[in-house]
Design a protein with these regions (language model features):
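Glycine- and acidic
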Residues: 6-11, 100-108, 228-240, 273-280
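Internal metal/ion-chelating core segments
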Residues: 171-246, 251
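Non-catalytic terminal regions of proteins
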Residues: 102, 109, 113, 264-513
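Post-HExxH zinc-binding segment in Zn-dependent metallohydrolases
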Residues: 124-189, 245-263, 274-284
């Protein structure tokens, strides 16, 4: 291991003890588990520095949004006693190793077993960032952020902060309209400007990119939008949110098990820390809880040969009793981290047996929690989406395939997709946007056209709550785009009940047709 690999710093000084531990954990991850990851520099920081790091990670430009995020994060940490264990920041170029080095922030108020568990957790994130096909091409280079900030300040001097923020706000809006799934669409894209009615010549899913190429704007406006697009390309990594947190928690538990072999007390504390975070009784912790347990289940199934066509055709009881000594669990887990998005992860590997185990464990934990607090189940948890999700599976016996999509939408791993349909832009009629609801086709079974329409209407109604974008944020976004391009903007979508609706922004008002 190189002399500058995996340094742990507190201020300007290297913490020798934690640096040695970080290197020992890295060696365990690489040699025992087979992980591969880039170099990292761990920085022990206080809550104020952590809040600043969180704010500038998402918005490295010196904007109102960065300041707002900092104030919110700092208030939560300092006044509400909320604590963030770690944050993996952007990478920078490491000249010594001729490769990438990630900057990782760890809360220095953490206890020793927490810091060591967090370092193990971070190595899981770094493995995903290096190897997963979604993450590898959608990370932001920290080394250019300072140059972007200087240029942003210069533009404020040239045209005024209000003008710059107006375009920045538009950029934030368009950042939600990048193509989250570019690898799934292989049509060759047009690269030339056109005002014909067949522009674009195909369905265009990267609305941000299309606006940059086809809308007339001032050079400084284009420069700001290009800055924002570059920075917000990291949004695509939401496609692996469950896998990211699940795999990091998975290897964190592996390290806790290793520690337990020689130090039971510390190993137990590490397990308690992990399962306090990967808690299925908390809406916000679902990516950790579900991802961890699904990775563990996959490892067990591939260790015991419980997979494949022959196994899947066995009766339920025979599947439970089936077991071979295959020992390919970790190999399979690593293969998934490289080749899958959350969509593949959930739809391919979350089978009925796992759903039964997961819901049983969650309900057992719930009963313990309720006995301790002496409250009625529905009284405390009826508004939690995870509780409704579990009840739909156990009480209502909802199709697991529907519940999988809901899980993906609730954890941001599948966001509503908006695109420009073929011929949806010209200088007379404006810009037409359409919500892509093709994801619902998997729940329509009939081949008869009339019946398919009826079934699709029913499916839209069932998923309307998760997929509708008819809210104040959408109205404001459409108005912002319309004012910038000086043309009407129409969005074809569904309302809260699943009915087709078109929202129009004409530069003065926003209304539904």
């Amino acid at each position: 291991m190189e002399a500058d690999e995996f340094l742990v710093k507190e201020g300007a000084f290297v913490n020798d003890y934690y640096t040695q531990k970080a290197r020992e954990i890295a060696k365990f991850m690489r040699e025992k588990l087979g992980l591969s990851f880039d170099n990292a520099e761990f920085r022990l920081v206080n809550n104020d520095d952590m809040a600043e790091s969180m704010a500038t990670y998402g918005d490295p430009l010196p904007t109102w949004a960065t300041g707002q995020n900092y104030i919110i994060s700092r208030t939560e940490m300092m006044d509400l006693h909320y604590s963030l264990y770690e944050m993996v920041g952007h990478y920078t170029y490491d000249s010594f190793s001729n490769g990438r080095k990630f900057i990782v922030y760890i809360n220095k108020s953490d206890r020793e077993h927490e810091i060591l568990g967090v370092i193990a957790h971070v190595y899981g994130h770094l493995h995903m960032d290096k190897n997963n096909f979604v993450c590898a091409d959608n990370l932001s280079d920290l080394s250019k952020h300072s140059a972007l900030r200087r240029r942003y300040r210069k533009l404020e001097e040239l045209v005024g902060s209000k003008e710059v923020e107006r375009v920045f706000d538009l950029g934030q809006t368009l950042a939600g309209l990048i193509d989250l799934y570019p690898t799934s669409r292989t049509e060759k894209k047009q690269e030339y400007y056109s005002t014909d009615k067949d522009s674009p010549g195909h369905d265009e899913y990267d609305v941000f990119d299309f606006v940059l190429k086809n809308v007339t704007m001032l050079p400084w406006e284009r420069e700001i939008l290009e800055m924002v697009k570059d920075i917000y390309s990291t949004y695509r990594t939401v496609r692996v949110k469950i896998m990211h947190e699940g795999f990091a928690s998975f290897v964190q538990e592996k390290y806790a098990e290793e520690v337990s072999k020689t130090d039971i007390d510390t190993g137990l504390k590490m397990h308690e820390l992990l399962y306090a975070i990967a808690n299925p009784l908390n809406d916000s912790q679902m990516p950790y809880a579900f991802g961890l347990r699904l990775f563990k289940d996959i490892e067990k199934r591939w260790n015991e040969g419980k997979h494949g066509l022959v196994y899947s055709q066995l009766p339920r009881q025979d599947r439970l009793e089936y077991k071979t000594d295959e020992k390919r669990g970790m190999e399979k887990v690593l293969d998934i981290t490289r080749s899958c998005s959350d969509w593949d992860f959930i739809f391919k590997y979350c089978d009925e047996d796992f759903m039964d185990k997961y819901t049983k464990e969650t309900l057992d934990m719930l009963e313990v929690e309720l006995r301790r607090e002496a409250v009625e189940r529905d009284e405390k948890y009826e508004k939690s989406w995870w509780y409704k999700w579990i009840m739909r599976y156990t009480r209502e016996r909802t199709d697991p395939e529907e519940l999988k999509l809901e899980l993906l939408t609730r954890t941001e791993s599948y966001s509503p997709t908006v695109y420009i349909p073929k011929g949806g832009f010209n200088n007379q009629e404006g810009l037409t946007l359409k919500q892509d609801l093709s994801v619902l086709d998997r729940y329509v079974n009939s081949t008869d056209p009339d019946k398919r329409e009826e079934e699709l209407a029913e499916v839209k109604a069932r998923f309307a709550e998760q997929l509708t974008v008819t809210n104040g944020f959408t109205y404001a976004a459409l108005s912002r785009v319309s004012n910038f391009i000086k043309l009407p903007v129409r969005l074809q979508t569904i309302d809260e009940e699943g009915n087709d609706i078109t929202i129009v922004a004409d530069g003065e008002d926003v209304y539904a047709e």
